[in-house]
Amino acid sequence: MTGIGEQSIAEQVRRLLEPVLERDGYELVEVEWARLAGRWTLRVFIDKAGGVGIDDCQAVSKTVEPILDVADVIEPAYDLEVSSPGLDRPLRKPGDFDRYAGQRVHVKAYGPVAGTAPGAPARKHWTGVLKGFRDGAVELDVDGVLHRVPHDQIAKANLEYDVEGDLRRKD
């Protein structure tokens, strides 16, 4: 779990690295600052058109290490990990929700949200097919019902990899 200090460090790192990575053709998807197995770890998740490989992760690591050292925003010793966002890629920006329209997603709100669909009870979780981002809300089809979740109410949204569907397509 990320505390206030951890959020602050992650946000400082994001502001510092985002323009540099964009210049180099990468999208900074997410920054995580957490204590794992007794050590501080800074995780930087990147993406680019066509996907991210190990060479990209190594290149970004070599680019950001000196920037982080000079900026000195992180006091304790830490491990730096650079990777792709993975199959369960987080969705944050409005453009993310349009780019991944048609994909299966899981959306979690900060608290129960009422009125996301006509007659729907207040709820905190939705899993369905992403339709896109319209008028400040994320639209998704949950079992044939269109739900609109206000973007400012979303705590977390991720792509949800459909293993069974992928296996069926390969047969």
Swiss-Prot record:
Protein name according to UniProt: Ribosome maturation factor RimP
Q: Looking at the keywords, is Cytoplasm present?
A: yes
What GO CC annotations are associated with the protein? cytosol
Task: Give the Pfam families listed for this entry.
Answer: DUF150_C, RimP_N
- InterPro entries for the chain: Ribosome_maturation_RimP, RimP_C, RimP_C_sf, RimP_N, RimP_N_sf
A single BP term in Gene Ontology: ribosomal small subunit assembly
Q: Which domain of life is it from?
A: Bacteria
Family, according to the entry, reads as follows: Belongs to the RimP family.
> Could you confirm whether the keyword Cytoplasm appears in this record?
yes
Outline what the protein does: Required for maturation of 30S ribosomal subunits.
